[in-house]
Amino acid sequence: MEKVVLIICLTASFFSAFPQNSPTERQLIESTIQNYFDGWATGDSTKVSKAMHASCHLKNYNNGKFIEFTKNQYIGLFKPHARPANLSTRIVSIDITNNMGSAKIEISTAKDLFTDYFNLMKTNEGWFIADKVSTRTPHKIFDVNAIRLEKETILEGLKRPWSIVFISEDEVLISEKEGDLVKVNLLNKEKTKIKGFPTDLEDSLGGFGDNTGKFEVLLDPDFKTNKFIYLSYAAKAATKGRTTKIIRAVLENQSLQQIKVLFVAEPHTHERVHYGGGMLFGNDGKLYFTIGERLFTEKDEPSIPIAQNIEDKRGKIYRINSDGTIPNDNPYFGDKATPGLYAIGIRAAQGLTLEINTSKIWFSEHGTHQGDEINVLKAGGNYGWPMKTTGKYRFAEFAPKPILGNTYTEPVWSWLQTVAPTGLHFYVGQEFAAWNHNLLVGGLSKGSLWRLTIENETIKSTEELFVNDRLRIRKVVQSPMGKLYILSDELNGKLIRVKNGAL
């Protein structure tokens, strides 16, 4: 009996030695709302009921008439049915204070857009919808031919901006590759430099051939509560050269405080290209980021190419927890693999984006001579570089020796011409309703903006926009209210709103 007790105690101690990742309050609220979405979409009254507190009341005002339902009256309206193919859902915003919260959600059907505002509360049993108000807006009928693209410059004077994130509809953070991290009020154009950036930042030498500087700025999913932001940049180390570094900081009083280093893509090298630096939070709450291979030409590849070497941090995509620890469910690449690996075979990926209706992550990849790609991120995927490319090698004599047993993930799209794709974004909104769930991709080479229509993981069509008004585009984003913006990569960089002049 003593042996049995000892084994149990040791087993319990073993498992307790590994930290268990608890869901955040935001993730718990998202789970509650997902129950509501799933029940609403399929008529499952049990799931709708699970999301709502017993005291929940539901209200709307329609055609001059006030309507109110109790929880039981509301769930009594649901009858089981198949999920409509053209139904989509999204959480627009969540705000949390202690055990209270509010959320705005949207449910889009073939004919209508339903917008609900939830008040939520946390009890001993979890988060519940305490009450909701709702409205219904019929979709306007749009045709691609009814779209008239227009540009409106909102902000200029940016020093090769690399990334933008919205704190609110009218306030943004912008990282300038050759300048500062700035907070900007889009209404009065007031620009404030964020102080406290790490002193190991390697400055750009200027010019299109130097990728060095500041890269992505990203808000924590719980930013309103914890004030965490994440930054990627080129960091220097004495005579060793430079590399990509990922940090987390608290944004307080226009300053970076409590800086924590999450990742350093060692080794440092003297090259000034292909840092990667794209970052994204997935729907799983994990931080994904890209690290470039850091070579300009293939002739400098070692015997085991950098992007194929699981012991080398370069040329990879990573998945980590927001505090820098490694998730237990990451793919296994081998005992010697660098921690946090999620995918390998990456050359110079910069853009990451989340497909809202599927939770898939898509990314853009730069080829060496043509070979620019769009990929879907797969756990454990090997995207082939430099063993294979859809383009050509810059060093024509390069012939990589095959690696026995390797299999490679094919891109979902590649261009015949050089595009240099950067920040990409799935559009969801009403201003360009015909573009819903289309992928918008900015390009640096020759200045381009692309619209790709998608079915599952297949590109069905492509359209190049603004062909007579080209601009080096670094980022495509939407504001919290759905306005579409592009960020231009110029010495006089601009934040430009893309508008539909037909409305």
Briefly describe each language-model feature range.
Residues D131, E152-L155, K191-T199, S255-V264, ...:
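Beta-propeller fold detector
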Residues D203-F208, T212-K214, K224, E293-E463, ...:
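Beta-propeller domain segments
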Residues M1-P23:
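Bacterial Sec-dependent N-terminal signal peptides
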Residues L113-I141:
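Short beta-strand edge/turn micro-motifs at domain boundaries
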Residues I346, T458-P480:
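Conserved blade-ending motifs and adjacent loop-strand segments that build the rim/top face
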Residues T24-R26, H57, Y61-N62, I67-L113:
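Surface-exposed, charged secondary-structure patches
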Residues M100, K140-E293, G351-L354, S359-F363, ...:
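Acidic, Gly/Ser/Thr-rich repeat motifs that build Ca2+-stabilized beta-propeller blades
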